[in-house]
Regions:
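Structural motif
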Residues: 92, 211-224, 277-283
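A short, charged helix-loop
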Residues: 197-209
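Globin-like tetrapyrrole-binding proteins
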Residues: 229
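PAPS-dependent sulfotransferase catalytic core
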Residues: 295-303
């Protein structure tokens, strides 16, 4: 099914390439796609921000040529204004900058690229999706969690307070999307003037209403699929690629792939890891990772 999607997205009269990071999404796409060129960017030498070394090893393993670029500080700041201009509107997502540069190097080699956007939203790839079942604390009665959360909110600087406050609220109250900087309360304290902007819950309520009978993981994915992915992920992907006259295609968002993803039970999207690692006790995109293992080189697997 995914192979068919990649094959369909490769149909073009021009050469097609593939973006490649160390993540399973782009790796899966690049491994399945029979393209000659992959493209990667990074910052500095720290592996946390520079995946070029791994991308070159992976490309070599799948017999493809990798084109890469280390983004220098002066290039970052030098293009920032131009990148914001290309976005047409404010977007507080620094990932747009790396995307701009990887599109830049790809556009010099190909006219169409395949990318891994959408996999996190449909297969359950964000760590926050493990939150609903992450602790035994959730088994406490709701009124007790609310009481503890309300009391904990008075001690802003204490470690663990945010966890207790969040767990004292229902999912519909605490989860307003995959990424945000300030809570509504913090926003009101920071802004010097009153605004007529709706509260986040007013925006998310219609979406939660449509999945009110679903499990919490599915609710979170549904919200991100309709707000985060549409308003950020795909928005910046389209605008950063078009800034370089490059066509970006997303095989994971083929309707057949999305249909299959929808049938996967939540426990196979985010599942408990058989490990003693207390910091990462859950595996995200579990079902998709199992599928990807069949096509990606074993020697390049990352934990």
């Amino acid at each position: 099914m995914f192979h068919n999607s990649v094959k369909a997205h490769k149909i073009a009269d021009v050469e097609v390439g593939s973006f490649l990071s160390s993540g399973v999404d782009s790796s899966y796409v690049a491994a399945v796609a029979d393209v000659d060129k992959t493209f990667t960017v990074g910052f500095g030498k720290d592996e946390k921000y520079n995946e070029i070394g791994w991308a070159k090893e992976f490309s070599k393993a799948i017999k493809k040529k990798n084109y890469s670029k280390v983004i220098k500080p002066e290039e970052y700041w030098g293009e920032l204004k131009h990148i914001q201009y290309q976005m047409d509107e404010p977007l507080a997502d620094p990932a747009a900058i790396a995307l701009f540069f990887v599109c830049q190097i790809a556009s010099k080699q190909v006219k169409v690229v395949l990318s891994g956007e959408g996999a996190d939203e449909i297969f359950g790839g964000y760590n926050v999706y493990s939150e609903p079942n992450a602790t035994a604390y959730d088994k406490l009665p709701r009124f007790i969690r609310r009481g503890i959360g309300s009391a904990a909110g008075k001690f802003h600087s204490r470690k663990g307070v945010n966890f207790l406050v969040r767990k004292g609220k229902d999912l519909e109250e605490r989860f307003i999307g995959n990424a945000y900087m300030f809570t509504p309360e913090e926003r009101k304290n920071l802004l010097k003037i009153e605004t007529n902007a709706p509260d986040p819950q007013e925006i998310t309520a219609p979406y939660y209403e449509k999945v009110q009978d679903c499990d919490d993981v599915t609710k979170m994915q549904y919200l991100d699929l309709h707000l985060w992915m549409a308003g950020d992920i795909l928005l910046k992907a389209d605008k950063m690629s078009m800034a370089h006259s490059l066509e970006l295609r997303v095989p994971f968002l083929d309707k057949e792939v999305m249909y299959v993803a929808e049938q996967i039970p939540a426990k196979y999207r985010v599942t408990r890891k058989e490990t003693t690692d207390k910091d990462t006790p859950y595996v995200t995109k579990y079902a998709m990772r199992l599928a990807a293992k069949k096509d990606t080189p074993k020697e390049t697997e990352k934990t």
